[in-house]
């Protein structure tokens, strides 16, 4: 059975803040010099978690993937983010996957900040030439704060989240 874990008020508060607001970015998720922001988006959506046995045999919440709209500063959808594998797709059909280089915790209940090195794009369009994707200003999305044991095996939880996704190109 699927349930929705609501995170009250975060989307309203973030809607009033500027995209990719000035924040001190930890060094571990800083994009290397020689790359400049080519596109800024706000991802708004959900992350699917399942209660199941982990690789070490213990029960726990296992990340199953995101499903989010990527919106521009005016709130217009310009792409989507989904997986697995983690895929960022522009409305023009071009898309990228990538290799996670680093994550940095961003508070209880929030998925971590992230730095991803992009693989070459599929298709022509906005994702062509993207070198890195940086996830900042994360709100929500972390594994559910509820029991995951044999009694809850195979339970699926959907957790809402929002984050800024910055796409970089070599300049």
Label each PLM-derived region with a short phrase:
Residues 1-8:
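Bacterial N-terminal signal peptides that target proteins for export
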Residues 8-17:
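Bacterial N-terminal signal peptides
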Residues 18-22:
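Sec/Tat signal peptide C-region and signal peptidase I cleavage site
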Residues 23-46, 55-171:
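Primary mode marks residue(s) on the alpha4-beta5-alpha5 output face of response regulator receiver
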């Amino acid at each position: 059975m699927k349930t929705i874990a609501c995170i009250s008020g975060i989307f309203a508060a973030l809607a009033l803040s500027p995209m990719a607001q000035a924040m001190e970015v930890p060094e571990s998720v800083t994009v290397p010099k020689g790359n400049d922001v080519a596109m800024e988006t706000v991802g708004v959506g959900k992350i699917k978690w399942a209660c199941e046995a982990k690789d070490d045999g213990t029960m726990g919440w296992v990340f199953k993937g995101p499903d989010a709209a990527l919106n521009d500063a005016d709130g217009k959808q310009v792409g989507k983010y989904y997986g697995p594998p983690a895929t960022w797709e522009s409305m023009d059909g071009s898309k990228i996957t990538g290799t996670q280089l680093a994550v940095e915790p961003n508070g209880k209940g929030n998925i971590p900040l992230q730095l991803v090195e992009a693989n070459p794009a599929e298709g022509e369009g906005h994702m062509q030439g993207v070198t890195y994707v940086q996830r900042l200003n994360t709100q929500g999305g972390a594994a559910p704060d509820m029991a995951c044991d044999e009694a809850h095996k195979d339970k699926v939880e959907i957790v809402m989240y929002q984050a800024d996704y910055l796409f970089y190109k070599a300049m």
